[in-house]
Amino acid sequence: MRYAKGSLVISPERDIPLLRQVRNSKFVSHHQLFELMKLGGFDHSRNSFNWRVKRLLDSGHVGICQSVYGAGSAVYRITKDGITLLEHHGQFTAVLHSNTEHLPHLSQVFHSLELNAVQLALWRANLLAGWQSEIEIASFNTISRAPYQKDYDAIVDIWIGDRKVRFALEYERILKSLKQYERIRAALEAERQIECVLYLTSGMEVLVHLVHEFQSVRKRLAFADAAAFERHLLDTVVTGRDGITARLWDVLQ
């Protein structure tokens, strides 16, 4: 089949997974996106990937964040046209769709990039069995009769031997207000579908504060520095809400 010169031909096997990843990540760097596509089995050639991204940028389905520096490569986000195209291919979410007034704010860039880095670290180590993004979780919570109590940053399935283990993941880059933590404590107490919540933090000061905020929550909680987790993964030494430390491997057993 021949196409008109300059027309954009969308590949359901290559373009749609890429657009879906950009949407679900909220923000993703060029390097991260290539690795996510490669590990997902969608694109193994960097030249092919670069060409694909350029097409989607030129067509306005993906946008580049011009004012973001320090990410190591260009940072992308989905556009309204990109969301509309995803919906045309059956990829709808209840919380980020073509009628959504505001797209994710630039203030969330480095939060999103860190979550991408965590996902990639688990994937490279062949530990990742499943990853549901905040977009997917929030969409599920909107329409489900049995929602999770919180829109977690991710719900993660990992392999421990031949067994799958699930936990909720939260990344705390900056501290929230006392009122927000009060609501979060109530949500964690009420959660029945998730047995363990792993809080990764941007530094030890945030970690210590979180342990203090959540020490009364009757839930299996673990706290760790995000950079340490990316290095050690299941061998990361985590702190419980009671201040006792253990390897994450043992906490998840």
Predicted regions and their residues:
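Nuclease-adjacent, charged terminal/linker segments that flank catalytic cores
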Residues: M1-H97, E101-H102
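Non-catalytic C-terminal interaction segments of nucleic acid-processing enzymes
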Residues: Y3, I16-L19, L175-R183, A190-Q253
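Structural motif
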Residues: K26, G60, N126, R192-E195
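Hydrophobic, Leu/Ile/Phe/Ala-enriched alpha-helical segments that form helix-helix packing faces
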Residues: M37, V53, L57, L86, ...
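Soluble or luminal CAZymes and related metallo-dependent hydrolases
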Residues: S48, F110-E114, Q180
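Active-site metal-binding core of divalent-cation-utilizing nuclease and nuclease-like domains
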Residues: C65-Q66, S107-F110, Q119-F167, R173-S177
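A short, highly charged nucleic-acid-interacting micro-segment common to nuclease
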Residues: N99-N116
